[in-house]
């Protein structure tokens, strides 16, 4: 069955939830192939992204997980005649969590640990809508000109904030045009306060993966592509700092039903559902101080990032997860074949991967287990990390580079790991288990040697070993 992926996987309306529930209860769904990223390659004239479902009518309950595959282009000549499947494009969704609306988007771009982090954020912090209600704020989208059937002179001469020239944090009224028209479709009759100072104005589309907002201390109007919030200026500045953080972008990359599926903007309802920590007076003052500095230096956002991560009480490994999604997932979506995801890793990247996979395995198996590592890298398309199982050790990663014989071996191995069927280009990563060694063989591309990749590989190694012990 081929159908729109948005309705099947990402919409959260009651109608869509009922359809998904009936689909899974009335049939044995074996696999779902989410073709959203391939929309432009496979369906030139499609009005929306598609998904394919492989299923049989239900005769008896089955317990095996649903295979969920999200193939993604590799932006080479192979994309013209085939579609590509990477090992990270395939996951197995346990049937006891298929009713979780979040799983399909997170599994599309993230990893199991991202589901944990998103769940932690949602369970720990109330949505922005609650923050807005508790602080008696007023929200709405701006006016809409549309069919221009209604005449209204209320906005004439007021500063006009426009999405196309939106400036983050603050813009002087002298820099803005003024309203010189009086024809509208919608004039925001019931929430006019959003145009009154002080107000926070949020741009619903992002710029380079970040969402922009500004707090103005003068009255101004704007159209429906911008959101307005009227309230106390300290709380508005706090929200602006949170909205500008990588955490805000990370959350919506992995939960929003439109972004990285078909459109590059958020709907108002999605923004209001963002988990927001409740600040105390000291934290409000700190946010205002950071905001005021950003007005003069909008690119100096390291203080903003540190503040936001402290507010969300993130641990170091959770910060790595967030950075990986922005630096690699979003960068892949934006820059395609020019993405840093496809570039060769630095030795420091390999060392971070090694330290991370070693740390996860040591914590999982206990402090009695120790690992050292040998890394084989060269000019070949593959890199090999050998984990030596031994007593606890503080040895650094041993790096072996540019051996002609090694390069030849890795080139031949790379060819053997590609399943080159007529219409499918599938690549397999390789793990080999020996009594005292674990071989991890993967392409020499940065996306395979990140912190998040290390956590995923370590979890799968533990699962493989646990199955062997049974």
Task: Describe the residue ranges of each PLM region.
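Generic recognition of stable, solvent-exposed alpha-helical segments in well-folded globular domains
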Residues: 3-4, 11-14, 18, 24-27, ...
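Short helix/loop capping segments that flank catalytic or ligand/cofactor-binding pockets
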Residues: 63-64, 169-172, 210-214, 237-239, ...
